């Protein structure tokens, strides 16, 4: 899990308005810390909490840095389409994928799978950088197999070391450009 060190390796190419999609584990925590770093650097950052619980210390750091937090309470992004809360999803110059990471097992289900489907659909209509932390959400870390819905990344930040799912076919097609980030 990322330390709130202020290290900005791998984020210098992100535009001025970033939206993160945050799951309940360390991957979501890393996304919140990334938003905090970006916000402290003057970049507008919004984080959508997709699970009822999230990484509390990272959430506090993001809030302290001025990140806009939108808590969906475990509901899918589909629940906010055509509402004012949808604007930060649609207007963002870049997205950070912190939904699930290497600790996830099996395909995405329920609201998370539905949210990823919504994001993939919107990304096809309005392309933008999609930055995954460790692995794109929905990829398994073990063998690179495609077992369900996966958020297609344009960039993947390999934290600490490269992961097998980032480089093994057919999953490699979902990782985009891969950058090694050391903390």
Mark where each language-model region is.
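Nucleotide and nucleotide-moiety/phosphate-recognizing core
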Residues: 1-101, 105-133
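YjeF_N-associated NAD(P)HX repair module
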Residues: 91-183
């Amino acid at each position: 899990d990322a330390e709130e060190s202020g290290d900005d390796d791998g984020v210098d190419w992100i535009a001025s308005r970033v939206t993160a999609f945050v799951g309940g584990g360390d991957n979501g925590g890393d996304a919140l810390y990334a938003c905090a770093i970006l916000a402290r650097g003057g970049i507008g950052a919004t984080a959508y909490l997709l699970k009822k619980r999230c990484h509390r210390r990272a959430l506090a750091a993001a809030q302290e840095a001025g990140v806009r937090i939108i808590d969906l309470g475990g509901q899918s992004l589909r629940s906010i389409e055509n509402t004012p809360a949808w604007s930060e999803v649609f207007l963002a110059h870049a997205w950070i994928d912190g939904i699930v990471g290497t600790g996830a097992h099996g395909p995405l289900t329920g609201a998370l799978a539905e949210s990823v489907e919504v994001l993939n659909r919107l990304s096809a209509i309005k392309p933008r950088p999609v930055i995954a932390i460790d692995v794109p959400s929905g990829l398994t870390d073990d063998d690179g197999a495609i077992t369900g819905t996966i958020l297609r990344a344009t960039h993947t930040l390999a934290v600490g070391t490269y992961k097998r799912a980032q480089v093994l076919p057919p999953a490699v097609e979902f990782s985009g450009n891969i950058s090694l980030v050391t903390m």
